[in-house]
Swiss-Prot record:
<feature type="domain" description="ABC transporter 1">
    <location>
        <begin position="2"/>
        <end position="243"/>
    </location>
</feature>
<feature type="binding site">
    <location>
        <begin position="36"/>
        <end position="43"/>
    </location>
    <ligand>
        <name>ATP 1</name>
    </ligand>
</feature>
<comment type="function">
    <text>Probably part of an ABC transporter complex. Responsible for energy coupling to the transport system.</text>
</comment>
<feature type="binding site">
    <location>
        <begin position="347"/>
        <end position="354"/>
    </location>
    <ligand>
        <name>ATP 2</name>
    </ligand>
</feature>
<keyword id="KW-1003">Cell membrane</keyword>
<protein>
    <recommendedName>
        <fullName>Putative ABC transporter ATP-binding protein SAV_5847</fullName>
        <ecNumber>7.-.-.-</ecNumber>
    </recommendedName>
</protein>
<keyword id="KW-0472">Membrane</keyword>
<feature type="compositionally biased region" description="Low complexity">
    <location>
        <begin position="272"/>
        <end position="288"/>
    </location>
</feature>
<dbReference type="GO" id="GO:0005524">
    <property type="term" value="F:ATP binding"/>
</dbReference>
<feature type="region of interest" description="Disordered">
    <location>
        <begin position="268"/>
        <end position="299"/>
    </location>
</feature>
<dbReference type="GO" id="GO:0016887">
    <property type="term" value="F:ATP hydrolysis activity"/>
</dbReference>
<comment type="similarity">
    <text>Belongs to the ABC transporter superfamily.</text>
</comment>
<keyword id="KW-0547">Nucleotide-binding</keyword>
<dbReference type="InterPro" id="IPR027417">
    <property type="entry name" value="P-loop_NTPase"/>
</dbReference>
<dbReference type="GO" id="GO:0043190">
    <property type="term" value="C:ATP-binding cassette (ABC) transporter complex"/>
</dbReference>
<dbReference type="InterPro" id="IPR003593">
    <property type="entry name" value="AAA+_ATPase"/>
</dbReference>
<dbReference type="InterPro" id="IPR050095">
    <property type="entry name" value="ECF_ABC_transporter_ATP-bd"/>
</dbReference>
């Protein structure tokens, strides 16, 4: 159904092809997962299927790509639209209409599908993706994950023969990601749909793949195999594979269920070692002294009482209520963050995580209750003063970057922060060695842009650092570097609050997890205790080794050493 014959793509101005000699076939009714480190050309391969490469991106494509027999070089993307549905990395650039319902119908309208069929499919898709309550909402008012659901829904409604998906679950909460993948699998099994999907969070997707295509390094040949074959040698792999390799399991398990069946002996060995402490990973490097009054048990479904802390809190939120349009986005939220503490804010799409971060930087005013950051009330504090107290790296780092070059961005950041000239540039060099002054932020990779936005925010050395979905689009290596950096910042006394759907990141990094549901705090406690209590938010290692309380492969490796 999809066929690559010796394909190379060279972007304009590039000395070398981005991908070369790509040669593989995806038969009808198969789900193939495309994996590899950041920047190896996964999006480029996907773009060659939908025709975006080279028609929209420019550059030269050599060799031949055919989809359902049509050559994508001689057929423009719109001439492929009846067979290929595409979801790109940035849902916002994808939308053509204003409201959820119109967007779901749009693709079908342009293909001339009968009105009664359209109506039925829109209803089905609204239910399938949990969008029914949002059907009349302007898309611009949706949360990041809600937008990603609409983007996926809008390509499903026309029932294309081929789906090309670039990180379709990156903004979805864990339960929604599972639901979307189950829907895709049903389309593949029941309708014979062919799916080619790139994804970094392999723990979410690898078990759904019929085969895995690996681009191991830039310019290296693509290899195709069964998931266990490819995972045995891949430079990117999920925690279940990491644990399997550590324990020497063969064949490698790819699912929690398979790994649990093998884990008996490992559990016994681990039982003889010291049981991990609730914040073992975090305490290994940079935890604040645990305050004796910090709650030891998650307070599921109970209102959290303010806890007096040894260190004066950097942020104190009390009984906060926030309205966004007609929506009560936050209700009765209490939260404190102390110096050196890393807090992961988790919860379903639309639960209010970004809104809470927005309230902490004064972007959204409270409708009730109070927010104090370093003693100031954020929405009443002048930006110049506020940047020295709190900084937010937004879900889309691009939203923070306005200048045409990295150097100009840094000069502006120094000015805004009242910092010594050169402060931001020094941070960029530390975080992003080798990036030239003249580079346009637009041409940076996702991970590089995140690092630049982080440097811009850190220029003012804010005691409170907020990050919204910081691991979107990052590969495991980049995530590892981010973890090291954030731990060092916490050790330096910064309080860090991150909104994330990445349960593996929370397990690795956070001292505390706060779960929001429908605008309210439903759990707040040490990471191990909160995630162990919740199947949705438990990392793979926890599920595999339960009832023991291990969170990460790093902990297990250290215990066995
Ligand atoms: N339109 C373009 N013009 C020039 N260079 C590009 C263009 N699109 C991508 N590139 C470059 O091609 C390389 C591969 O990018 P691509 O987005 O295909 O990688 P990827 O594997 O999808 O990465 P990620 O996992 O970070 O999304 C990168 O170095 C990128 O900078
Ligand atoms: N401008 C707006 N008008 C109306 N409702 C809004 C607006 N902005 C956000 N909302 C709603 O407020 C709720 C909270 O949104 P928020 O972005 O805080 O969620 P989130 O937990 O960060 O979600 P996600 O995980 O999807 O990023 C959602 O139901 C969202 O649709």
């Amino acid at each position: 159904m999809i066929r690559f014959e010796d394909v190379s793509v060279t972007y304009d101005g590039a000395a070398e092809p981005t991908v070369r000699g790509v040669d593989f076939t995806v038969p009808e009714g198969e789900l193939v997962l495309l994996v590899g480190p950041s920047g190896v050309g996964k999006s480029t391969v996907l773009g060659a299927v939908s025709g975006l490469v080279p028609h929209f991106t420019g550059g030269t494509l050599r060799g031949r790509v055919t989809v359902a027999g049509r050559d994508t070089r001689t057929h423009k993307p719109r001439e492929l639209a009846d067979v290929v549905g595409t979801v790109g990395q940035d849902p916002l650039s994808h939308f053509v209409t204003d409201t959820v319902e119109d967007e779901l119908a749009y693709g079908m309208e342009s293909l001339g599908i009968a009105p009664d069929v359209m109506r039925r499919r829109v209803e089905e898709t609204l239910d399938l993706l949990g969008l029914a309550e949002l059907r009349d909402r302007p898309i611009s008012t949706l949360s990041g994950g809600q937008q990603q659901r609409v983007a996926i829904g809008s390509v499903l409604t026309p029932h294309p023969k081929v789906l090309v998906l670039d990180e379709p679950t990156s903004a979805l909460d864990p339960a929604a990601a599972e639901e979307v993948l189950a829907v895709l699998q049903r389309l593949v099994h029941d309708l014979g749909t062919t799916v080619l999907m790139a994804e970094h969070r392999l723990e979410r997707v690898v078990q759904y793949a019929d085969r895995v295509a690996l681009l191991p390094a830039p310019g290296a040949p693509l290899t195709l195999g069964t998931p266990p074959e490819v995972m045995a040698a891949s430079p990117v792999y999920p925690p279940v594979v990491d644990l399997g390799r550590l324990a020497g399991w063969s064949p490698l398990p790819l699912t929690v269920r398979d790994a649990r069946r093998r884990a008996g002996a490992l559990r016994e060995r681990l039982a003889a070692t010291e049981t991990p402490t609730p914040t073992a990973t975090a305490t290994a490097t940079a935890a604040p002294a645990p305050s004796p009054s910090r709650p030891r048990r998650p307070r599921l479904l109970r209102k959290r009482a303010p806890v007096p802390s040894a260190a004066l809190p950097v942020a104190a939120v009390e009984a906060l209520a926030v309205r966004r349009g007609r929506v009560e986005a936050l209700r009765r939220v209490d939260l404190t963050a102390s110096p050196g503490e890393i807090i992961a804010l988790m919860g379903r799409n639309g639960a209010g995580k970004s809104t809470l971060l927005g309230a902490l930087v004064g972007l959204v005013p409270p409708a009730g209750g109070s927010v104090r950051v370093g003693g100031a009330v954020p929405h009443r504090t002048a930006p110049r003063d506020l940047v020295r107290r709190v900084g937010l790296v937004p879900q889309e780092p691009r939203d923070l970057l306005y200048a045409d070059t990295v150097a100009a961005e840094c000069v502006a950041a120094d000015g805004d922060a009242g910092a010594e000239p050169g402060t931001c540039r020094a941070l960029v060099s530390e975080l992003l060695p080798g990036v030239a002054d003249g580079t346009h932020p637009r041409d940076l990779s996702e991970g590089q842009r995140l690092a630049l936005a982080l440097a811009v925010v850190l220029t003012a050395r804010p005691p409170l650092l907020l990050l919204d979905e910081p691991t979107r689009g990052l590969d495991y290596a980049a995530k590892g570097r981010l973890v090291t950096l954030l731990r060092a910042l916490a050790a330096d006394g910064h309080a860090i609050v991150l909104a994330t759907h990445d349960v593996e990141l929370a397990a690795e990094l956070a001292h505390r997890v706060v779960i929001l549901a429908a605008g309210e705090v439903v759990a707040d406690g040490p990471t191990a205790e909160v995630v162990v209590a919740s199947p949705s938010f438990a990392p793979q290692v926890t599920k595999i080794l339960a009832p023991q309380h291990w969170l990460t492969v790093t902990q297990v490796r250290e215990a066995l050493a």
